[in-house]
Amino acid sequence: MAIKLKGHETFALREGWLNKGLAKVDANPKVFSENYGADALGVGSNMAKAIRYWLKAGKFMEEPPKEGAKLTDIGQIIFKEDKYLEDIFSLWIFHINLAGNEKLATSWYAFFNLINIDEFSKEDLMNILLEKLTPLAEKKAIPERSLRDDISVLLNMYVKEKQQNYDPEENKISPFAQLGL
């Protein structure tokens, strides 16, 4: 199996990104293929790539060849019934899809399905993930920098940290911290 690391461009999923992405894909299936995804989403180009990645990794969007982007069945339901992802159940659905997606979110898959530890350091997690992912990597070397970036993003998505001098314009808070994982 090919593993996927760092598709998120080192951006943890932020508050508002899923609903913004769902709305833009629903309105225009070519939003990511016409090279104006960043403008349409009102973010930088790497953030637009990250939003695209998160929508696909969480199985809220797919990109069939020659069709552009389209919402999956669950993406359509979430967009229709909980457009702003205010219901924690919508976040749980996304989390379950992400944690089960070994193809696009390999580190999340390994962390939530192959590892059973309560306490760890980043270095511990790095070593454990290397051990778990090496057999999945089909004899290819695992780029340690990419794995470190995945670990940082994964932890930033689920850990609720108190931020000093919080600036709402930065909006780096991930909605998944409220899952309490």
Language-model segments: which ranges?
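Donor-sugar nucleotide-binding helix/loop cap in glycosyltransferases
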Residues: 1-181
